[in-house]
Amino acid sequence: FPTVSLPGAAVWHVPWTEKDDGLDWQAYFHQRNRWVAALLHSPYPRGASFPKTSLASDVRALLSLQYYSADLRRQGLKDVLLGPGHLHPSMHTRAAEARAKAKEYTDARLMTEAADFPAVHRKKPAPVGTKPDSRAQFISKAIAGITKQFLPEGEHREDRVEDVLSSTDARWWRLANLNSALVSNAEGSGAWRYQRDAKHYRRALAESIALHAELIRR
């Protein structure tokens, strides 16, 4: 497209730090399109480290209790496995289907009224996860976080959460230590309730591993 210079004018754009596009319906397209691009253009056999980083992203989402975006990512993998023939028929339906799926997940239903926010209740101070600053710490925290996801969640109450986190603080090494949390969105206009579900985690992790293995096999 042609461009023009307009002295004295500027264009404002929302900063990337204030976007949640990796957590909403767009997560499906991020995952599917990355794989399609890698399959078409990667010069490396089997995409080199790409399948590993893709699986790691799924694990990170699950450790962060972001079950909605993790499930959309797996749907993206399933559609990649269907082959290119699905792209055009699904072009006009996948976005609406992804949005509709948000109703099934508390971590996708944005609460904007303070009266709807659950109270913070702790029997003891919530564990404060810190960013791993070495490979050894990263591995140790990842193993601890993954192990916790297999344990029973304990008491579950809709009117309580263990902690409140901003979007910038909602990282896997903090969320993996919690059973529940209230997490604000990037722009600060609302919050989601994150709730750990060990059964869902086990099923989702197994499915993600199987899908990645099948993509590598093919």
Q: What annotation goes with each model-predicted range?
A:
Residues P7-L23:
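Active-site donor/metal-binding and catalytic loop motifs
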Residues L23-Q26, P51:
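Secondary-structure capping and boundary motifs in well-ordered enzyme cores
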Residues R32-R218:
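Terminal low-complexity segments of carbohydrate-biosynthetic enzymes
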